[in-house]
Amino acid sequence: MSLLHIAVLLPLIFALIIPFVYRFYKRIHLGWFVLPIPVVLFIYFLSYISTTMSGNTIMEKANWMPHFGMNFNLYVDGLGLLFSLLITGIGCLIVLYSISYLSRQEQLGHFYCYLLLFMGAMLGLVLSDNLIILYLFWELTSFSSFLLISFWRDKQASIYGAQKSMLVTVFGGLSLLGGIILLSIAGGTTSIQELINNASEIQTSPFFIFSMILVLIGAMTKSAQFPFYVWLPDAMEAPTPVSAYLHSATMVKAGLYLVARMTPIFAVSQGWIWTVTAVGLITLFWASLNATKQQDLKGILAFSTVSQLGMIMAMLGVGAVSFHFEGAESQIYIAAFTAAIFHLINHATFKGALFMITGAVDHSTGTRDVKKLGGLLTIMPISFTITLITSLSMAGIPPFNGFLSKEKFLESMIEVTNVNLFSLDTLGILIPITAIIGSVFTFVYSIRFIGQIFLGSYKEDKLPKKAHEVSPLMLISPSILAILVIVFGLFPAILSGSIIEPAVNAIGQTTNSTAEFHMFHGFTPAFFSTLGIYIVGIVLIITFSYWIYLLQKQPTKLTINYWYNKFGDVTPRYSSKFTDTYVTGFTRNNLVIIFASLIVIALVTLLVTPFNIDFKDVSAIRPFELIIVVLIITAASMIIFAKSRLFSIIMASAVGYSVAIFFIFFGAPDLALTQFVVESISTALFLLCFYHLPNLNRHKETRSFKLVNIVISVGAGIVVTVLGLIAYGNRHFGSIAEFYKTHVYDLAHGTNMVNVILVDFRGTDTLFESSVLGIAGLGVYTMIKLRAKNDKSDEGGKNVEQTEE
């Protein structure tokens, strides 16, 4: 195991340790103990920049379950390193921010355990080269995010938001699992890099389209794309550090990472290009439109996050066009990848800061309701400055980093209309139109976000508590991000060669991509589009009160959230009715369903699959064997017609003893002896127990009841017999008995094969069987003791009553 493996597992290890630290040492805020972990990891991953800048990659392998294609292989390239730096870098700032946000009275041991669990899961997800391991970390992010969102579990809204996020993302995870299975079948491997190298082979597979659809569903649920975005707004009930971490820089970017990583495999399909682009643009438009009507600051940021994720998704879709061209023409569309990666970084900076400032405002005023806020400019000047910088960046206004990536976004959306491929030159006109409209509403909610908090009149009477500027410690993290917004806007070359180009090369499978960003490109279509966005946006802000009521009057039934809740209400009711049709509470009915299903499956398989029953190696039936079989059949048949329990027990014992005689004739005396002992003890116990039971009252079953029993019994007997004969006559592998014959002495140092198998070769199985018997015995002992205790209590109660009388 390499140092890279340790780096990925480090947060998971400390997630187990931190709760114990909190339990025994509470004098210092637990966050100070956690902070060094992401700091050390961030510094460690910075050391890989020189490697990825030179075009090299690193593969660290660790065998886990190679026979199942599950090896813990980690792969560091430009894309994985970018996400690792975001996860650990933003993680440092989040932990620092949480120290001032969460008081010591909170369950900090739980919080930081969940946070580190999530951090480790995200690192494993973005660095794993094995699809199965990636999926395990993918689901671990869903699980840990559920714990984080429901951290304040005394609030019903937190539980609701956590459940919704869990249901939607786990649904996507199951879809992703299906896609992974089909993809690994098509490519013959679970290694992502090997799959990329075998992309041409996968693209001719009949599983190609199905795996693509399933992978996209998984990615879109995780990154809150339309129509799966419904979980993200309700997830805002989490503590602000969680929202700032999960929903600005990490979890919601996991779907984008998956799309970027899978692009070299699926980019050949026009379905991939159109779906990723269209879904991204629809998400951008719909979420930005909904963000304008939100009354909660976190609600605004939630929908703005969804819209920004849609924007990045659309850029990844357009960038996939580059796989259909070569040379300079390909570089035109690779620029969309460049814009996507740059905006991925930019979004983490300005959105992370805005979430933290929202938490600061809530911490200061006691509310996030925009109707109660306003006029905080003079009261919270530092918070205002940070909000101004980051909101203008989100709006796409120079000289901030958001402007540069937004310009690249518009250029890519306009440029793709020139592609004579997949009808992009005709239907593609909708792409820049949708992008521009979505950008207009992005401008509107970004600018209004500033005014709703800090401008206007101060409404002291509406605030739960007197507003004040928050502590310097709470402002350090958003201040750092605000500074980065300015630095990356004025000096984008800091990121170009070191971070962006290696990441773009990893997505586009190239080595010569260039990332150049300029504040002014000339009088281009993108420039005029930006001017139009500003002008229309300002007009909409001025006339906001005249048109917003139209959005607020949107019928509830036209929202996806309404149908999600409807489905959640209806499903348990109808599923309960359906379950009641076959779960009746009677063991016999359950067994009928189980055996009937097995019989039907087996018979259908036998009918559609050719098989052969070979009797050539079957030994002759000896007379005494025939006699024993007749005895077994006779005894078993008589149990059916028995009129007393005693007779049934005797006949069942006769069957067992007859089978034991078989064991003797077939050379297994120890097994026969064991069978004799078991039968004798069982018979004695049954007789002792049934002696104390009331007489057997027979009741007449209906004819249909008996008929079903007969059909199931005969069917099960036929199926087992036929399958046994088929298995005997079709031996594709050597008998395992030869292994035991060869190694029973030299490996286990025993001469009795049956005993050696039970005690040595299958020792663990025997141990657990013994454990089951022990647990059953403890259960019986407990029931007897409880009954005796209750009997004594009843007697004591009677004595008390008599005394009182």
UniProtKB/Swiss-Prot annotation:
GO terms for molecular function: antiporter activity. GO terms for biological process: proton transmembrane transport; sodium ion transport. It is a multi-pass membrane protein. GO terms for cellular component: plasma membrane. Keywords: Antiport, Cell membrane, Hydrogen ion transport, Ion transport, Membrane, Sodium, Sodium transport, Transmembrane, Transmembrane helix, Transport. InterPro entries: CPA3_Na-H_Antiporter_A (IPR050616), MrpA/MnhA1/PhaAB (IPR005663), MrpA_C/MbhD (IPR025383), MrpA_C/MbhE (IPR046806), ND/Mrp_TM (IPR001750), Proton_antipo_N (IPR001516). Its main location: membrane. Pfam families: MbhD, MbhE, Proton_antipo_M, Proton_antipo_N. It is found in: Cell membrane. The chain crosses the membrane at residues 1-21, 30-50, 79-99, 117-137, 166-186, 201-221, 226-246, 265-285, 300-320, 337-357, 377-397, 427-447, 480-500, 531-551, 591-611, 623-643, 646-666, 671-691, 707-727, 766-786. May form a heterooligomeric complex that consists of seven subunits: mnhA1, mnhB1, mnhC1, mnhD1, mnhE1, mnhF1 and mnhG1. Belongs to the CPA3 antiporters (TC 2.A.63) subunit A family. PANTHER family: NA(+)/H(+) ANTIPORTER SUBUNIT, NA(+)_H(+) ANTIPORTER SUBUNIT A. Mnh complex is a Na(+)/H(+) antiporter involved in Na(+) excretion. This is Na(+)/H(+) antiporter subunit A1. It comes from Staphylococcus saprophyticus subsp. saprophyticus (strain ATCC 15305 / DSM 20229 / NCIMB 8711 / NCTC 7292 / S-41).
